[in-house]
Each structure stands twice: as structure tokens, then as C-alpha cells.
Amino acid sequence: MNIHEYQGKDILRKFGVAVPKGIVAFSPEEAKQAAIQLFEEQNSPVVVIKAQIHAGGRGKAGGVKLAKSPEEVFDIAQQMLGITLVTHQTGPEGKEVRRLLVEEGMNIDKEFYVGITLDRSTSQNVLMVSTEGGMEIEKVAEETPEKLLKIQVNPLFGLQAFQARQAAFFLELEGEQFKNTVKFITALYNAYTSIDAAIAEINPLVVTKEGRVLALDAKINFDSNALFRHKDFLELRDISEEDPFEVEASKSNLNYVRLDGNVGCMVNGAGLAMGTMDMIQLAGGRPANFLDVGGGASPQTVEEGFKIILSDKNVKAILVNIFGGIVRCDRVAGGIIEAAKKVDLHLPVIVRLEGTNASIAQKMLDESGLNLIAAKGLHDAAKKVHEALEPA
């Protein structure tokens, strides 16, 4: 689960992670009042107005501005609130700006990158630091790997003091800056593990000319599987930032990810779903989604799956690929037939069912009288998808 920058900073602050003073605003007047408060409390001659959306690259897209007076903050907030911000992470559709973070300005001396996430290849947490603050870390790792240090952290022992010092040495810091960075990294790791985060990314981490070490930006993503331990975090979810199709699918406990293709997929099992998407691509189509209805696919979940797929106007054909192991194929076929009767299935639907009671399911589909195209095997299904996409 993703959250906004200001929410992430509020959480980090509770764990002793140094962050700038900031106030969230939902209107130009609130932004102005926040600026008045910050100018009174801070020594900085400027404040920063930052658009709050679930995407990076805001600065280049005009989502981060400096202001020297409350009146200027008001004007910038008027211009920024309600606009659609398009960055390299939002896609061409962009995201609407509904809230702003008004934050104290920093007298920046140096910028770095610090991030913590799970390294699945080693089953350990990995602390990453780079001298290239403000840059995309993937680009740094690819083009200048010598500027990125990765430190494996055994979750049984946690981050050791020497590892935090190793990271600070890599950043070539000395004196108070060194001590403050070690303290910062230690606090960040504590926060990361305590809140069951999937990633805690500070980009950039700044060192001011006064020696302060702070998180100028913060990206915190939670492990959704651990949210039962942090039910208060559910209040931080901003559904308006999420794909509406994915939100609707989650209500029916469907694992759905929207893509930009033209073939809708309905599959049971993540591995089979990935293989199905590959076959669609090889057959000349492009998958429009990842949709895993789970091992216990019922008529209700199949119907909801069809509704969600058909909501995507880019879909030109649908491939249903079910292996009947936990769930019987005849039960799935019944769900497909019932869903087809309730939902306006105006698109070609290719159905491939294998496993328990597959022959019974095949007979049910053949006798349904509906426009359902049966496929024998995955290759045949991919071939029929290709044929369905070809212009008449």
C-alpha cells in the first residue's frame, strides 16, 4: 500500500528520523496559513510547496515550487491544486493534485540517496546508499554502479552499528555530519522494520550547511500482507490515487493489475497468469490485465472478473484460462455461463479449461448457446485469440 510523502514523514518523525517541518494543505487558504506558521517558526527565507501524488518526478513536472511569502504560496497553491500532473511515473493520463505539502526550505550542502527494501534473491533486507541524491536509483545502478553501495542486513540480527558507519563512510562524511547520518540511517531502519514497510526510500537525503541531516523526500510503501498488524495505517490509504479498476477488483478479493493491452485475461493462479500473458504476447496480442481469480473461483468471482475486464474500453477479446485443481472445471464453466448471461459479452471470449471435470465443462460450454470459443490447450487458445483480433 502506497501513502503520500507527508504521511510517510509523519510516521518517520515518530521513530526519530529527522524530517523538515511541514504542514499539509487542501486549499490555497490552508497553504497560506501553513506558510505564515512556518515563516514565524523557521529561519528559512523560503518555503517549498510540493504536490502530493503517488508518483515521483514531481519537480520536473512543475509539482515542486519555492515561495518567499505567504501571498506567493497562496498564488502557487491556486495554480497547483486541481491540475493534472504528468510525470514519467504517472503515465500519460497523469494524476490530479488534491493536496499540497508546505515545508520549510533547506540550506542544502549535499544530497544523497538512502533506501531500504527486501532483497528477494538473498532473503535479507538491503540498505542502499548513493552519492547521487535526487537521481533515479535504477539509473545510477545501471550507469554508475560504483556510486551505489548495497549492504545486506540479516533480519535476525538487524542493522549493526558498523553497517550504518560503513554507509556513512561511503558517502565521505566527517564529524557531525557523519554522526548525524549514522543516527539517521539507524532510525530509518528501525522505522522500516517496525512498520513492516516494503520499501523506505529517502531521495534525496540532504546535509545542510549547518550540519543537519534530513529526509527532504520520503517514499514509504507498506507490505499489504502485514497490514493486519497496523490497522491504523489503513486510514492513510488514498483510493483516489489508485487505479479504479484495481480498487473495484480488491472489493471482490481479485488480484488485478491493469495493463495497456487489448486482450483481457482471467486465470486462476499467478504462475498460470504470467504464462498466459506471455502466450498472448507471442500470438500477436497484448495483455490488458493480470487477473487471478484464485484457487476457489466461484460464479460470483467469475462474474465480477468479467465486469472489471469489460470496463476497460481497450479490451478487444477475452481469454479465460483455468486449470481445475482445487476448483472443478464444471463449476467454473457454470460461472462463465451465468456471467455471460448477466453481463453484456459483446466481445469474443476464448475459454480453455483443463483438469478436474474438464470434459463435462467443455460440454456445458458447447451446449450453452453462447458465443464462447472453446480451446484445446494453451497454444490453441493463443491461436484463437490471434484469430479473434484479426479484422473481419
Swiss-Prot record:
Q: Where is the ATP-grasp domain?
A: 9-248
- Family designation: Belongs to the succinate/malate CoA ligase beta subunit family.
Q: Which cofactor does it need?
A: Mg(2+)
**UniProt-listed PROSITE patterns:** ATP_GRASP (PS50975), SUCCINYL_COA_LIG_3 (PS01217)
Q: What is this protein called?
A: Succinate--CoA ligase [ADP-forming] subunit beta
The UniProt note on the cofactor reads as follows: Binds 1 Mg(2+) ion per subunit.
The record's catalysed reaction(s) read:
succinate + ATP + CoA = succinyl-CoA + ADP + phosphate; GTP + succinate + CoA = succinyl-CoA + GDP + phosphate
Task: Print the keywords alphabetically.
Answer: ATP-binding, Ligase, Magnesium, Metal-binding, Nucleotide-binding, Tricarboxylic acid cycle
Q: Which HAMAP family match?
A: Succ_CoA_beta
MF terms from GO for this chain are: ATP binding; magnesium ion binding; succinate-CoA ligase (ADP-forming) activity; succinate-CoA ligase (GDP-forming) activity
Q: Which InterPro entries does the protein's record reference?
A: ATP-grasp, ATP-grasp_succ-CoA_synth-type, ATP_grasp_subdomain_1, Succ-CoA_synthase_bsu_CS, SUCC_ACL_C, Succ_CoA_ligase-like_bsu, Succinyl-CoA_synth-like
Q: State its Enzyme Commission number(s).
A: 6.2.1.5
Q: Which SUPFAM superfamilies does its entry note? A: Glutathione synthetase ATP-binding domain-like, Succinyl-CoA synthetase domains
Task: Report any one BP term from Gene Ontology.
Answer: tricarboxylic acid cycle
Which sites bind Mg(2+)? 203, 217
The pathway entry for this protein reads as: Carbohydrate metabolism; tricarboxylic acid cycle; succinate from succinyl-CoA (ligase route): step 1/1
Name a single GO cellular component. Answer: succinate-CoA ligase complex
Q: Name the source organism.
A: Chlorobium phaeobacteroides (strain DSM 266 / SMG 266 / 2430)
